[in-house]
Amino acid sequence: MPVAAVIAEWNPLHRGHLLPLEAARHRGATHTVAIVSGNFVQRGEPALCPWQYRVAAALHSGVDLVLQLPLPYAVSTAEHFAAGAVQSLSALGCVDTLVFGSECGDLAALQRVAAALESPALPAELAPRLASGL
């Protein structure tokens, strides 16, 4: 019973937001979970639509379970937003796959960027450039 999850704001939810979950179902996921910011989104802005409307739309669109990302993570930086969401999904103990969409659509390019950001050499290479104002 593979479970796929997505981390989102859905402010508001639109068809494109559902594509990663639909792709996961086509790859064998039998259940889907979404963790979504509540009535406030990143940068502390109020959500366009109330939380309840976004949950109803997600459930109506086929998402099996919608969880609310705790407020301190929802209004935080992208790094803390993602960390809080991943920790929450991990605590469920049933999520097998984390799915996402991207504007570029190039998984290989995203993997290269991720590898570069995780490189132990990055801080040493970045520090002199930042110090020079680059």
Residue ranges and their predicted role:
Residues 1-134:
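Nucleotidyltransferase catalytic core that binds NTPs
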